[in-house]
Structure formats: C-alpha cells, structure tokens
Regions:
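Polytopic transmembrane helical bundles with strong interfacial aromatic enrichment
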Residues: 2-164
Length: 164
C-alpha cells in the first residue's frame, strides 16, 4: 500500500501525473518557440513534474538504482527551473538557464517514459529485454538528440517581454 492505495492503483496515478507533465511540458516548449510564457500551463507543467518526482520516491526503494538517480537529478533540475523562473524572473542569463532546465525536466520525464515503455510494452520489451540492446540505445539517443535540438531552438526563440 502507498498512501492508502494498492501499488497498482498508485502506479496508474503516477503515470497519469507524468503524462500530464509531459503533455503540458510540450505545450510550454511550443510556447517558448513562439516566445510566450504561458504562465498557467507552465505552472501545471512544473507542478506535475514535481509531483511525478515526489510520487516516484514513494515507490518501494531497494538500494540505489538508476531510477533513484534520475529522480534525484530531476529534483535538482526542477529546483533550478523554479529558481530561474520565480526568483530570478528570467532576467539576463536566467532566461537561457530556465530554458535549459525546463527542457531538461521535460526530457527526464520522456527518458523515463521510454525506459518504462521498453519494460512494460511487450513488443518493445521483446526488442530490448534488458534495455542494453541496440533498439533501446538508438531510441534513447534519438530522444536525446531531439531534445538537444529543442533546447537550442528554444534558447534562440524564447525572448519574452520583461514582466512588470
């Protein structure tokens, strides 16, 4: 039981929260490309991303695992994102720091989605049962390359007017 829910029910809740984080994050990145802040969608993205990390830490932990490492990294990156946006208000270098951190937060959610897809989706699991096979590595490399490109474009395009 986790928070009064079966592990299965809690897992479904965690996945729904994560999918909301990914969906809203993609909208936020689209806003960056158009130089729009999208404050409500951004708040949803950051909140659900934080909730994804928090709920991820509530699963049973048996020693340090790559999943735990990604969760810790996600929290650090999210803290930088929040600081750049809400404390420094995207002023000067904080604008591009925010872009990098926000897109990295989204990337980490997608990275875990890919990992879990290869674990849970039988067709993908058959291609890479241990996540060390080429189909898994190629997929993760492609996702990383796409997110690097997204980050570079967002850094150039995201130049919102200063908040008053």
């Amino acid at each position: 039981m986790i928070l009064g829910m079966s592990v299965g029910t809690f897992t479904v809740l965690h996945v729904i929260i994560t999918l909301i984080a990914i969906g809203s994050g993609l909208i936020v990145v689209g806003g960056m490309f158009a130089s729009h802040r999208l404050p409500v969608t951004t708040a949803l993205f950051l909140f659900t991303t934080a909730l994804t990390s928090v709920t991820g830490f509530l699963f049973p932990i048996h020693g340090f695992t790559p999943a735990l490492g990604v969760g810790i990294l996600a929290c650090v990156v999210l803290a930088v994102t929040l600081f750049a946006l809400y404390k420094e208000h995207l002023v000067d270098t904080w604008r591009w720091i925010y872009v990098i951190a926000a897109v990295a937060s989204l990337y980490l959610n997608v990275f875990v989605l890919v990992v879990q897809s290869f674990v849970k989706v039988s067709a993908l699991s058959a291609l890479a049962p241990t996540q060390t096979e080429p189909p898994f590595a190629i997929t993760q490399a492609a996702v990383l390359a796409i997110f690097i490109l997204i980050t570079l474009v967002a850094i150039v395009k995201f130049r919102p007017p200063r908040a008053v």
